[in-house]
Amino acid sequence: MKNTLIILLICLSPACIFSQVVITNTNFSLGTTGRIGVGLSPNGEGTQWKPLNLSGQGSLAGRMEQNDYMDLLPAIHFTPKLNGTDSTNVTFQVRLGMYSANGQFMGNTSTRTANGLTIILPETYIEARNIMGSRWSAWAGVRFRRYDDIHICDYFYFDDHSAQGFGVSYKTTELTLLMPASTDSSGVYPYNYAVTVAGATNPAIRQRQVWIGEHSIKFKDGSIIKLLGEFHYVPVTSKKALKYYPADNGWVAGIKYSNPLKTTLPGSFNQFSIRYGTGIANGGDNGNTFTWATYGPPDANGKYTHAYSFTTVEHFLLNLSRQVSINGYGVFTQSQGGSSSPNMDTYFNGTQMYNHKRDIVVGGRFLFYATDWLHLIEEVHYASRKDGDNPEAAMWKFTFAPTIAPLGKRDPWCRPHIRLVFSAARYNDYARDNHYSPYLQINQNRWGTYIGVKTEWWLF
């Protein structure tokens, strides 16, 4: 036995000597983002606070009255070296998200409360960048893989690929595979069904595959053109399945132009994007832009052959002086489901849903830096939504928010903020009479109101 161990050690020693990985520069970081506070609606039922934005648009038209939420982002960063050669930057990232549902304050609820505190894990992944000193990078896991956003609306408008999967990149070219299947098919193309094999019936999931290719072209003046292409596919169910779903697919093409602008203070920019998706890749509703969240009901064959979605976005920031910054945006989206109906049709689970919609939202934020630490924020937004052949629901929203910026920077990105928020929304007749916002679902007023104190932060 002793001789066997000696021989084994001799065999393993060369491998250990020539391939030992030394971990250096080990670091732990903890970041956090969030928004929390209190507020009420002076003219609302029970003065209970409810979001003022139009239904189906999420935070588009501003999010000063957004639900409480908080993210914790622990991460481990390390740089392994192999025999003194070039290093690789490796990060293990986790994001723990918590938010309150049903309009409740986060501190007044818990996970035991019905529709109360919700805890999610939207990020757990490993990413290796510049592998062995090369221009190659790779990642695997689940992550918020998203880029430019309209911050005042929390709207990641072009390339939000948040889901589970993996990806590789070389220089400015990225290839990604996502698999966003779920047993909860509410609001998205159904993946879950049951299959009977040898007399036993068990649940199964159709695995949607989302192949994504992206390439960025960088210019000497700092401007960037980004090209996007996607292909989505879901397979057919077998003869043993209790439900028949045909195979289906879709594709996406898009282009985004980002251009830095020369103003008195740095940081100004203009961004413009166009994206078109077809088939099951026509997602983009409820304030998100996930192309895999298929919109609308299918056709008579259970497919989305003629479905589409078109979205264009304009977004800019102007840092005009030490006193003034202006952040503006415009969003247009038109989507069609798989059905030929101009109004409503039947979804897979038997419910009726709209087959066509159009969103138009424009707005902006004006920041006046009264002092280094007192910033006066004003916002104006206009939003409209047309579902099917219904009349248009529309809203104007106005917000004034004196803000304490304790870090004392005259910068639109300076955080944390402590804000005193006053918001008022004026609805048209159709929106008011048809409950076209969470606020209007418990009130039927021409004007919706909100007064509150909120804090917003991101610390990394």
What spans do the regions from the language model cover?
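Alpha-helix termini
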Residues: 79-85, 129-133, 261-264, 405-413
